[in-house]
Amino acid sequence: MQLVAYGAQDVYLTGNPQITFWKVTYRRHTNYAMESIEQTFNGQADFGRRVTCTVSRNGDLAFRTYLQVTLPEINQSMVTTDDEKNTTGCFARWLDCPGEQLISQVEVEIGGQRIDRQYGDWMHIWNQLTLTSEQEVGYNKMIGNTTQLTYLTDPSYAAVDGPCESSAPKQVCAPRNALPETTLYVPLQFWFCRNPGLALPLIALQYHEVKINLDLRPIDECLFAVNNTNSGSGSVKATTAYNQSLVAASLYVDYIFLDTDERRRMAQNPHEYLIEQLQFTGDESVGSSSNKIKLNFNHPCKELVWVVQPDANVDYCASLEGGQDLYHLFGAQPFNYSDALDSLPNALLAFSASARGADNVINSNLFDDAGAGAVDGATDEATNIGAGLAVDATSGSTVSDAGSFVLAETALTMHCWGENPVVTAKLQLNGQDRFSEREGTYFDLVQPFQHHTRHPDTGINVYSFALRPEEHQPSGTCNFSRIDNATLQLVLSNATVSGTATAKVRVYATNYNVLRVMSGMGGLAYSN
């Protein structure tokens, strides 16, 4: 009956059919092989240094590229007794997302010409917009955003498991008195890393070398390590911890090996690639509520992404001074783009007042405490957290050790911070409004909802000229090369710039360009 119930409208659906659901079809691909090969840097890669990797010609194409870096162990031997500082041990944590924070900037150059430059800050923002929920847990482990690395250590916690600590608990959930030596894998986001059709044709670049230059941040901007957690004033910096070096650092490149015919064509024929670049003209310091940010961009841009970060969020020096808010919150907050500090610190004691002391996790190395117990008072650290901040741990009941672990893991990507510093924003092109003035929430809620995979953290603002800016296929651009004067007008919240408070505005733009490869050399078709 269904088959014979056929009318004029069905012609639009099944007339002159082009496919069938009942016989699978597929397309044959060219033969190839892929292998990931380690590449070394020229010189010692360490905190605060710039190193270069010359990409060797191991294969025909270069595809996905990862930074592999091993963080040093930070343990209780890295503290010296100082009565004036009331030293009680080494309390340390890597700042959030250490793999991304470690990268100040990374750039790729071909034949001495810089083709693209990206930043750890941008990599964090991009993943906030594009990373799927299924990939989030694995990606966080790759870049070290785990409780093992970013939660505060304590001398009363269990030792790090290893050959010399046979009595240490094997469970990764047990709180530790040290930050373990850990290898991170940070995927780079260059155009050739994200799309196999844009893989870099090394076989066609016989006369031009491909180099990747990496600038690493100083350890002071990656680590929080103090001698005690209840100091009222003065420096409590655990100096020895800040003298550590990276254990190892290298790049892993996925090389593609082509079959004979395709390899010959790839080497002999000229190529044009539509590539994506990142533009960033540097931080702009602001101290008033109304600001005009000049956009010195070029080329057809897919979208604008901007953040406004209060300087108080990233005061690395203040975080090591007793009595300061960032000291009570255990370190600077480089990926906090809101107008207030994140008052949910990365420490077990934020969830259980008994965490700082001898409890079942430390004594038995297992979660034996099945229930919560009453607390008559709070520990020194819990009291200090509550001082002047939106956390009150001075009364109430603790939770079990297992509960503390579950809360810590759950809260790893949660935040108790402020609002979007951008109250309103407007883009002007050659003096004309590109759109009417909008509230800041439109740019960190509605625009990401329309154009991106994921809703980002508060304060990551987006305006997209494309329908699908995450895709390589162009779906809309604005050619900033043809615009003489582009201005982003921002009105900032009082919490961001009240009194003498200042902030940094960072505006990023993703654009298209053309990479031409011919006669063994490569270069951009359009310069700035």
Describe the predicted segments one by one.
Residues 1-528:
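Short, low-complexity Pro/Thr/Gly
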